[in-house]
């Protein structure tokens, strides 16, 4: 990518998300989504190879299809109500079409098939943007239209996303695909609580962004894209090795780490609203998600090499520049739940 084009591309991505999140007019919302989509395609093809080109084409086709469905829903609602504002959605069919389009953009099941493939086909940092920043615009629309969304369909999408995200990551050895399936699971948790308490959805999104950013930055610092490369990271950056397991466990939602806090709030909110079976099923299914993170940790830090003679030891480690971002994120990843009683005092 041309260095002169990078500020323009990233500014357009930021502007598109900002326009969508701050607009109450459907046309401006759709324009912001299109700006965001078109500007993100060069980010996916930062490294020109057949795999990144394939990922960019898949991303474009899925997002264009979702935008077309969303525009059809907007126009049908306008024909029936005569309004362009997001608060005036009177047709149930239009709201269902909007929900399907936004679920496709978010990568929720059963529209999730593009997320692992696109994430695998791009770089780690581009995958980080795909799984974090690109969620903001669709979730901001969902936040505004949730009063008219069919709750049963949204809960079905959420539970299916948690199931697919948990089962899909079991047989993966590519770390980007594992994080992509983890993203599908987290989106399912966010959307499950949206009709009952949208503020918990926003809090869940913030925690998810912190956890995913920490994981991607740690893997990028190690240049680890597979479980095999991650298991050899002890010979590259020894100081990072003890921190990766805590990050992965927090991403899987193990108490008392930070990743359990949003799940705790979601389960509490759903239980208050009389849906005891749904949060119980969600918690049980998410244990599968925690299992393949435990498997990653086992292959990374618990197992020892059978013989040290077969491994080339580095006599000089890489001189990495010190950064305050990763240690700060690591602290938030592990210590936010223990201070939660101070942050969320009980009445």
From Swiss-Prot:
Purpose: Core subunit of the mitochondrial membrane respiratory chain NADH dehydrogenase (Complex I) which catalyzes electron transfer from NADH through the respiratory chain, using ubiquinone as an electron acceptor. Essential for the catalytic activity and assembly of complex I.
GO molecular function term, any single one: NADH dehydrogenase (ubiquinone) activity
E.C. no: 7.1.1.2
Cellular component aspect of the GO annotation: mitochondrial inner membrane
Catalytic activity: a ubiquinone + NADH + 5 H(+)(in) = a ubiquinol + NAD(+) + 4 H(+)(out)
Name the UniProt record assigns to this protein: NADH-ubiquinone oxidoreductase chain 2
Gene encoding the protein: MT-ND2
Protein family per UniProt: Belongs to the complex I subunit 2 family.
Enzyme class: translocase
Subunit structure: Core subunit of respiratory chain NADH dehydrogenase (Complex I) which is composed of 45 different subunits. Interacts with TMEM242.
Pfam families: NADH_dehy_S2_C, Proton_antipo_M
Localization annotation: Mitochondrion inner membrane
């Amino acid at each position: 990518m041309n260095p002169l084009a990078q500020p323009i591309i990233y500014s357009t991505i930021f502007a598109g998300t900002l326009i969508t999140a701050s607009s109450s007019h459907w046309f401006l919302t759709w324009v912001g989504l299109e700006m965001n989509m078109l500007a993100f395609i060069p980010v996916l093809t930062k490294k020109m190879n057949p795999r990144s080109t394939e990922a960019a084409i898949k991303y474009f086709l899925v997002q264009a299809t979702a935008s077309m469905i969303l525009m059809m829903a907007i126009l049908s609602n306008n024909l029936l109500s005569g309004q362009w504002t997001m608060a005036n959605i009177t047709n149930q069919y239009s709201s269902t079409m909007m929900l399907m389009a936004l679920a496709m953009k978010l990568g929720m099941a059963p529209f999730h098939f593009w997320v692992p493939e696109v994430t695998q086909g791009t770089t780690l940092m581009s995958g980080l943007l795909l799984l974090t920043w690109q969620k903001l615009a669709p979730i901001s629309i969902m936040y505004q239209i949730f009063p008219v969304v069919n709750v049963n369909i949204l809960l079905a999408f959420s539970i299916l996303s948690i199931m697919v995200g948990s089962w899909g990551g079991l047989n993966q050895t590519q770390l980007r695909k594992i994080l992509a399936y983890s993203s599908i699971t987290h989106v399912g948790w966010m959307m499950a609580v949206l009709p009952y308490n949208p503020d918990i959805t926003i809090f869940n999104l913030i925690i998810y962004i912190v956890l995913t950013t920490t994981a991607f930055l740690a893997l990028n610092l190690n240049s680890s894209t597979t479980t095999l490369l991650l298991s050899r990271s002890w010979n590259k950056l020894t100081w990072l090795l003890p921190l990766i397991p805590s990050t992965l466990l927090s991403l899987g939602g193990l108490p008392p780490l930070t990743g359990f806090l949003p799940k705790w709030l979601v389960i509490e909110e759903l239980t208050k609203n009389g849906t005891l079976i749904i949060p119980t099923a969600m918690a049980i299914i998410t244990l599968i998600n925690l299992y393949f993170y435990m498997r990653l940790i086992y292959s990374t830090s618990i197992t020892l090499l059978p013989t040290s003679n077969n491994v080339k030891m580095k006599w000089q480690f890489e001189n990495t520049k010190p950064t305050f971002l990763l240690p700060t994120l690591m602290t938030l990843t592990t210590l936010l739940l223990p201070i939660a009683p101070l942050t969320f005092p009980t009445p």
